[in-house]
Amino acid sequence: MSVCLGVTKTIAVSSLGLYAGLLTTTTLVTASAPIDLLLPRTNENPIVNYFKSIVCSVGKISTVLSGLSTIFFGASYFGSPLSLRHPYLIYGMVIAPISAAYLYGASLFAHRHPSADQEKNNSPSPALDDSTVDLGKDFKHPKITPGEAGKCPFGSKTSIEASSESSRKNCNASIVAHLSVVTVFTILGFVQSVVGLYGEGHFV
């Protein structure tokens, strides 16, 4: 094995290993961090914004590492003699593209097929013209009839918050599940690349 091929293969395997490590860290953080830190919201405090900037930076670094591993695995495979074009180079080359395609497909499917909680939350509210409550010129709160004391015509705030909390938990579980699949797949690809490189150095 020439020095040039040895360098390209080392860079490829190292990049894939760092990529797998970042995916593992991201999965663990996502599983333990509150979903509110991961979803876009308004009026966020500086700590939340700082956390999201870190997540964004990690995503950019992961993209660079995955691109490096794909490029250098491809260069190592197609730049090697036919006798040295081992399958682990092809496997390592397709790890990042398959991972990206899986995450993109999962995200696309989730947006096109919302869950029951999301459909319930996104259901249209009754038109204002159909309301039996006269809001008046200076609206502060709808009128409450004596028979409905203690009830708010806007609905139960607790039930709305519970539904929203359920949606956030489902979203977090879905993100963690998809990240776990990609992480395991990437780690397996990294392990087989290390084994392939180790065996190649000893038996070729």
Curated annotation (Swiss-Prot):
Belongs to the ATG33 family. Involved in the selective degradation of mitochondria via autophagy during starvation and at post-log phase. GO terms for cellular component: mitochondrial outer membrane. GO terms for biological process: autophagy of mitochondrion; macroautophagy. This is Autophagy-related protein 33. It comes from the Eukaryota. The keyword Membrane applies. The keyword Ribonucleoprotein does not apply. Keywords: Autophagy, Membrane, Mitochondrion, Transmembrane, Transmembrane helix. It is found in: Mitochondrion membrane. Its main location: mitochondrion. The chain crosses the membrane at residues 11-31, 64-84, 89-109, 175-195. It is a multi-pass membrane protein. InterPro entries: ATG33.
